[in-house]
Swiss-Prot record:
GO biological process: CTP biosynthetic process; GTP biosynthetic process; UTP biosynthetic process
Annotated residues for binding of ATP: 11, 59, 87, 93, 104, 114
Name used for this protein in its record: Nucleoside diphosphate kinase
Name of the encoding gene: ndk
GO molecular function, one term: metal ion binding
SS bond partners: none
The EC number(s) this enzyme carries: 2.7.4.6
Amino acid sequence: MALERTFSMIKPDATRRNLTGAITKMLEDAGLRVIASRRVWMSRREAEGFYAVHKDRPFFGELVEFMSSAPTIVQVLEGENAIARNREVMGATNPANAAEGTIRKVHALSIGENSVHGSDAPETAAQEIKYWFSDTEIVG
């Protein structure tokens, strides 16, 4: 099976609580390798652009506010079936429904402050990676 790349983000609720290392370790322990990583404090404009797919949803304003409230860690992960593997280790969006041992079950505070984001398909992974990284910043 070929290696796959995906986008991952450690959200403000987790960076505020100094969970970057713990979450990255969980990703690496699941067989994912960090091949690009950067700490960013999103502007409102960057958050609106990144989450543009949700612009007509009722939670959009709150999402933008939250994502621009503190630093995030944006990452490119690589591994076998990286998209599915990342989503599995993240757990369900609602931490109450997340499986034991997943990032969201262990670290999330709520459905809104759920610690991590991960791409859901190859197309979104490519778009999300390109939003934050140039090709020269990704070192496999």
